[in-house]
Amino acid sequence: MKKIEAMIKPFKLDDVRESLSDIGISGMTITEVRGFGRQKGHTELYRGAEYMVDFLPKVKLEVVVPDELVDQCIEAIIETAQTGKIGDGKIFVYHVERAIRIRTGEENEDAI
């Protein structure tokens, strides 16, 4: 099993969720986050003064999937979240050693 963590633009969330649902991924965790990458934010003009906006709003999407769905999941996120502009986000993939559903005690792929 792998945990896929994607930082995406907030307005892309519904499209990404639908795309993942289309390939059979129904469970996910979403967190509103703020961050920046290489571009280190941008400047904005407010009441005649220029301000540096360091941390931009993003959505962190987390899913745990069987190994055989990893590539398909990554492709779905990229195809749906990509705008071609700076700040599209990042995807990280982690190994998950064990998963347990608290309510039933099911483990690993049965738990996801």
Curated annotation (Swiss-Prot):
InterPro entries, A to Z: N-reg_PII (IPR002187), N-reg_PII-like_a/b (IPR011322), N-reg_PII/ATP_PRibTrfase_C (IPR015867), N-reg_PII_CS (IPR017918), N-reg_PII_urydylation_site (IPR002332)
GO molecular function: ATP binding; enzyme regulator activity
GO cellular component, one term: cytosol
Free-text description of this protein's post-translational modifications in UniProt: Uridylylated/deuridylylated by GlnD.
O-UMP-tyrosine sites (modified residues): 51
Keywords associated with the record: Nucleotide-binding, Phosphoprotein, Transcription, Transcription regulation
Cleavable signal peptide: none
Any one biological process term the GO annotation gives: regulation of nitrogen utilization
One Pfam family matching this protein: P-II
Function, as annotated: P-II indirectly controls the transcription of the glutamine synthetase gene (GlnA). P-II prevents NR-II-catalyzed conversion of NR-I to NR-I-phosphate, the transcriptional activator of GlnA. When P-II is uridylylated to P-II-UMP, these events are reversed. When the ratio of Gln to 2-ketoglutarate decreases, P-II is uridylylated to P-II-UMP, which causes the deadenylation of glutamine synthetase by GlnE, so activating the enzyme.
Assembly notes: Homotrimer.
Family stated for the protein in its record: Belongs to the P(II) protein family.
Identification of the protein by name: Nitrogen regulatory protein P-II
Name of encoding gene: glnB
